């Protein structure tokens, strides 16, 4: 996959691509990246990329000329341009898996109060929000998206690791434990030490349901309505003495 990142602060994404799992994916040739400094396309002496909005209002907007030229400089066939913004559609795991099928992604890192609407109208395929909050740095939001998408690209993460992560079956991940067996008088659940794989699998599914019910009841409702929800899962849910309202079909 080719990833182009358009930013006013290239040092932020550069560190990310040189660290940990992403560095290995780059080294293995699975992920190719290019960081485009939008300031390189501003031709005034001070490399200004912002201006006040027409009609008044607080803050500044990223100007269309340097950003448009930066986008034009990206030579990638069949590229998908994504702008990360609080006003976009909510970013979820299913969308991450969908983007992982693209050959080329172009990420626009916003700053100030946003970008000129004409850039969105002419260049942007998707406006995406990573959560119901506002950040000062569009780079941080873009890196969240890049990380989630890259993990779904074949070869970046082991397949079995992906299959057991949160949200794969609309449930959050089960609790996990490692050494030592006892920590501050808290023991590892005995079933995990039993070596009985079927019992361990059932325990983990029950804990997934329990944890999702507690922290993300919206996901549990969706899970029950999905084709992946099994009779075993329904039985475990009933054992937890919890009843959910029917998931809406419309």
Curated annotation (Swiss-Prot):
Coiled coil: none annotated. Its EC number is 2.1.1.228. This is tRNA (guanine-N(1)-)-methyltransferase. The lineage of its organism: Bacteria, Pseudomonadati, Spirochaetota, Spirochaetia, Spirochaetales. The gene is trmD. Belongs to the RNA methyltransferase TrmD family. Disulfide bonds: none annotated. Specifically methylates guanosine-37 in various tRNAs. It catalyses: guanosine(37) in tRNA + S-adenosyl-L-methionine = N(1)-methylguanosine(37) in tRNA + S-adenosyl-L-homocysteine + H(+).
């Amino acid at each position: 996959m080719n990833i182009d990142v358009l930013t006013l602060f290239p040092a932020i994404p550069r560190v990310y691509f040189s660290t940990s799992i992403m560095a290995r994916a780059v080294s293995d040739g699975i992920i190719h990246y290019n960081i485009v400094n939008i300031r390189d396309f501003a031709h005034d002496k001070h490399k200004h990329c912002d201006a006040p909005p027409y009609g008044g209002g607080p803050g500044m907007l990223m100007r269309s000329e340097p950003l448009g030229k930066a986008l034009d400089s990206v030579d990638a066939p069949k590229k998908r341009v994504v702008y990360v913004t609080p006003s976009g559609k909510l970013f979820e795991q299913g969308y991450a898996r969908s983007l992982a099928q693209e050959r080329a992604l172009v990420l626009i890192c916003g700053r100030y109060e946003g970008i000129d609407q004409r850039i969105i109208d002419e260049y942007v395929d998707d406006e995406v929000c990573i959560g119901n909050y506002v950040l000062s740095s569009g780079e941080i939001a873009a890196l969240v998206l890049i990380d989630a998408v890259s993990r779904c690209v074949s070869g970046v993460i082991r397949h079995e690791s992906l299959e057991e992560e949160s949200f794969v079956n609309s449930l959050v991940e089960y609790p996990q434990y490692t050494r030592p067996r006892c920590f501050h008088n808290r023991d590892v659940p005995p079933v995990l030490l039993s070596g009985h794989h079927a019992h361990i699998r059932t325990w983990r599914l029950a804990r997934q349901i329990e944890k999702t019910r507690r922290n993300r009841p919206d996901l549990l409702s969706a899970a029950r309505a999905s084709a992946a929800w099994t009779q075993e899962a329904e039985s475990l849910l009933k054992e937890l003495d919890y009843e959910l309202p029917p998931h809406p079909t419309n």
